[in-house]
Amino acid sequence: MKRGIYAVLLVGVLIFSVVASGCIGGTQTQTETQTPEKTQTPTTTQPSPTTTTSPTQTTSQTPTETETHTQEAECGSGKVVIWHNMQPNELQVFQSLAEEYMAMCPDVEIVFEQKPDLENALKVAIPAGQGPDLFIWAHDWIGKFAEAGLLEPIDEYITDDLLQKFAPMAREAIEYKGHYYALPFAAETVAMIYNKKIVSEPPKTFDELKEVMEKYYDPNNEKYGIAWPINAYFISAIAQAFGGYYFDDKTEQPGLDKPETIEGFKFFFENIWPYMAPTADYNTQQSIFLEGRAPIMVNGPWSIGSVKDAGIDFGVAPLPPIIKDGKEYWPRPYGGVKLIYFAAGTHNKDAAWKFVKWFTTNPEVIKQLALDLGYIPVLSEVLNDPEIKNDPVIYGFGQAVQHAYLMPKSPKMGAVWGGVQGAIDEILKDPKHADIEAILKKYQEEILKNMQG
């Protein structure tokens, strides 16, 4: 997405900043899904602190010349106020769609209010009864906002038929501790970006990927088999491929000492790292691909602008499955989801629900967001639309989202990132001889201590 829903998490080595606006949450220079700290990757979970000034209100009753969407709208009445921190280009598209809805539902008024410091504005206004009906941000706020009583449950509106319209990761993103608080409209994760001049078709299995890495690994000429930033966010795909995890949102426990997680880490450092440049940072790895010194890069939608600027003829595809002992294991990278949340004490819940349901389940709306803004759809049927399938970026990342592991929603995840990164940094001191199992178990204990206070 435009600057990606990209979160920057730095706890110890990472911080929670936010991998979506271009980002998942709003649109500041930051996004909200949590990812490792890199200037090119996700930005921050916390909007940069600025004083909230008088809200900029935008209300329109006159439809613009946008395509007429055929899905019938359920109509409420009265005003629905939506707080956001979107960029101007995003806001323009959202307003256009809202105007279309208002043309079908003349008794409702949709008002967008810009909040530069959205999180703090919500934390002050909602308890005072002065909050919005809705607000837009990434799913990573759902845990801490629900715990603080800042969200309005919408359980009475949720049906199984509705949930099945969305990708599995998106369905999971809108629920916290048995209650639903939002509906999803876009997502983000990492995938393979491949140089078609070097590799005409993406590898379909990990064995095929390994053949490509072996073929093009030529360190004496500064050429490598793959470009892949090494940090907690980016290698989550392999670390979690065999059923392991950094953190279980349901039990709220870390999982670095799980056999499946250990297997994932070992697989990465035994089967991928040997074909990489020894410098693991984001900028170096991306530059290797942009300079044509690697056939494939693992990265997110936020990197596509740089890939295009480099003049590379590229494609996007999910990381391929690992076939082991006759079983297929799909890499499961972390992903984030953009949501429209219901604020606690919403003043016009029924009208807000009808608008949000229309907005998030109308295929033409989601298609327009994808084509105009580069948002990755989570409405499953849109991924089969011919225009979407013909867009290599949207379709490729959309397929990757189907295998993504949702970024944890619990506030306790904050204690996990630093421990995971610490383990990775220790392994990188000597990847060939590192006792990966012992290192992961060591940092499991460190995370548990940090979680306890």
Swiss-Prot record:
One of its GO terms (molecular function) is maltose binding. Keywords: Signal, Sugar transport, Transport. Pfam families: SBP_bac_1. InterPro entries: Maltose/Cyclodextrin-bd (IPR006060), SBP (IPR006059), SBP_1_CS (IPR006061). GO terms for biological process: maltodextrin transmembrane transport; maltose transport. One of its GO terms (cellular component) is ATP-binding cassette (ABC) transporter complex, substrate-binding subunit-containing. Residues 27-65 have a biased composition (Low complexity). Residues 27-73 are annotated as: Disordered. The keyword Transport applies. Belongs to the bacterial solute-binding protein 1 family. Involved in an abc transport system for maltotriose. This is Maltotriose-binding protein. The lineage of its organism: Archaea, Methanobacteriati, Methanobacteriota, Thermococci, Thermococcales. The gene is malE.
